[in-house]
Amino acid sequence: MDMKFYKCSHCGNIIAYVNASGVKASCCGEEMTEIVPKTADSSTEKHVPVVKVDGNLVTVTVGSTLHPMEEKHSIQWISLQTEQGNQRKALAPGQEPTAVFALAPGDKVVAAYEYCNLHGLWKA
């Protein structure tokens, strides 16, 4: 099952459901909006995560050409969905748009997500 992310249109909070019970997510007194990840990238700045697995280590890099990591335009986080759960790494301007995750024995990658402060949610 794909992860689902929701964003508050007032304060910008973003949540991901661990277990969706059917109750709508709300924030600031209103229902949150589901963020549908993009999967194709035609812009000059690449957003689609690139996933490389080496044994139990998974490296996720944002873009086949590295995404900028400036104050005004950067990747805020990278999330890895696996068969056994998910992991998230926060990023900051000035860092490389890359995160390394460790898989538990027998676990496998399902999807990788990243969130750009200007262009939203992306998935590979």
Q: Each predicted region: which residue ranges?
A:
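Short amphipathic, basic-aromatic surface patches that mediate peripheral association
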Residues: 62-70
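Short cysteine-rich clusters marking metal-coordination/redox-active sites
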Residues: 8-11, 27, 116
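Cys/His-rich microdomains that often coordinate metals
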Residues: 15, 31-32, 120
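Residues immediately within or flanking Cys/His clusters that coordinate Zn2+
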Residues: 5, 24, 113
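Short acidic/polar inter-strand loop motif in beta-rich domains
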Residues: 115-124
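Exposed aromatic-hydrophobic patches
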Residues: 61-62, 98-105
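Short Cys/His-rich "knuckle" micro-motifs
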Residues: 17-21, 35-38, 124
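Cysteine-rich micro-motifs
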Residues: 21-31
